[in-house]
Amino acid sequence: ALEATAARASGEQVHKMAGTDSPDGVRRVRDRLVTQGIVLADVHPNATLYLLNRDHVAADANVALARLRAMIIERITAGLSSWSPEPVHASLFGSFARGEATTTSDIDILVVIGPAGAADQDAQAARMDQLSADVLRWTGNRGHILEPTLDVLGAMIAADDPLVASWRADHIHLMGTRLLDLLRSVS
């Protein structure tokens, strides 16, 4: 979180910048980085202010590690953007979207294909296989792609499929029509 600023930040500000619900987890990581000298702590009577020590030999490596999630999202989005025609919608869902993924988790990707994309099923299948292989190569995690057509998506909504509720609850939009707008339009 501190890589985004050149200013000192309080513990609360670091937690907000980290974008996580776990203040204890952020505090433990921050304190470990202070112990290692990667983060500098400036103690004041009312607060301790933290600053990334950009001169530390491990600072760049730590910044790269902190950006892993964003880099994965960027790569998947770039891969999808190269498709012709582009998907109507694409988002990440499941444990990765919730920030709970482990080394054994799949990276779940919802890709909704419009009629033009569904017309050439062989080309579409090849693109899906390539994206799945790319995700595995980039992350070591299997890319699990769910690819409903608009008709199938409408049927899932009509059947009150629990997967739709899961998508509504936690997803990361990648491209195309926003998920909630898409769900409203096909229901």
What are these model-predicted stretches?
Residues F93-S95:
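Glycine-rich beta-strand-to-loop/alpha-helix junction loops that act as flexible
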Residues A1-H89, R98-T104, I113-S187:
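Catalytic core of pol beta-like nucleotidyltransferases
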Residues D108-L110:
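Short, well-ordered beta-strand segments
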